[in-house]
Amino acid sequence: KKTLENIFDIETRLFPCLVEMRFLGVRVDEEKAKTFGDTLKKEQAETLKTVKKETGLDVDIWAADSIQPLLDHQKITDYKITPKTGRASITKLYLESHTNKYLKMIAKARQLDKLFNTFVTGILKFIHKGRIHADINQIRSDQGGTVTGRFSMRNPNLQQIPARSELGSKIRELFLPEKGHKWGSFDYSQQE
């Protein structure tokens, strides 16, 4: 009972700070986000255009059945079979680690598509007067949160922006610090 009261006390003291964070939101460069989105879509289209030009095949990057003809065309047989369907299992890891340049291009096109659809469109969808006011979940509930006590976010989920990639860095550049302030990065690993 005492532990539960301690948790309640901590959560209650933290709540006003979270409300203020949500109301303030995060500044976003909307024009830069639109331009970056256009760049991602253009690069994806150019990548798939190269695949078609060099192989003669149109590929739907998310459909294994559409990638199968490319595997056949390139005489690639080292893929795993999905037991349920008996078809090729085309995972992210398989595409990224394969030596075939066309499979690497499909992996790249998938990454560009995911960044655009998950992050750029998510950011643009939730901008209000130059800011994003994401939901910050403090504790586990039907609306989100984690069982470990960490925060989670949604609408959009800013925590899922790739941390260690060049494109992830470009997405982070869309967020602006308050005037007269700078961003900082602090990683308190294993501090739960």
Predicted regions located by residue number:
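Conserved "right-hand" nucleotidyltransferase catalytic core of DNA-directed polymerases
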Residues: K1-K170, L176-K182, S189-E192
